[in-house]
């Protein structure tokens, strides 16, 4: 088997995730996420572990650290610009979005180089 089948280098710059609604249909929300398995992902994870804030807070910090941008997110008719603080607030407020980001970042297949 060719080792290129294990190349998840796309996770170092980020891959776009389309958020699904409650009916599993794609929305306009796109979140650019780094791979949990990449160099930056491991670095973000180790920093969260060192801070020892507890499992839930550490998971939140990792997700925020792996999120590098987005589009299509609005709240009360106002477009939200990406920032780590805003990502943290969204993930705390909207767990359905947070869960999709967490699952996506953990799945190495999402970051295979095409």
Feature map (PLM): residue ranges:
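Short, intrinsically disordered N-terminal pre-domain segments
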Residues: 1-12
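Exposed, low-complexity/repetitive linear segments and helix-based recognition motifs
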Residues: 4, 18-20, 58
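Short, surface-exposed, charged amphipathic helix/loop patches that serve as local interaction elements
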Residues: 23-114
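Short acidic-hydrophobic surface loop/beta-edge motif
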Residues: 13-24
């Amino acid at each position: 088997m060719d080792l290129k089948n294990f190349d998840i280098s796309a996770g170092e710059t980020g891959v776009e995730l389309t958020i699904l609604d409650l009916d599993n249909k794609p929305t306009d929300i796109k979140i650019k996420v780094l791979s949990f398995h990449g160099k930056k992902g491991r670095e973000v994870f180790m920093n969260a572990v060192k801070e020892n804030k507890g499992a839930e807070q550490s998971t939140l910090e990792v997700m925020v650290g792996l999120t590098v941008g987005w589009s299509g997110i609005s709240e009360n008719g106002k477009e939200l610009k990406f920032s780590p603080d805003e990502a943290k607030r969204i993930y705390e407020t909207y767990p359905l979005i947070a869960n999709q980001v967490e699952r996506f970042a953990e799945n190495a297949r999402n970051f295979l180089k095409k």
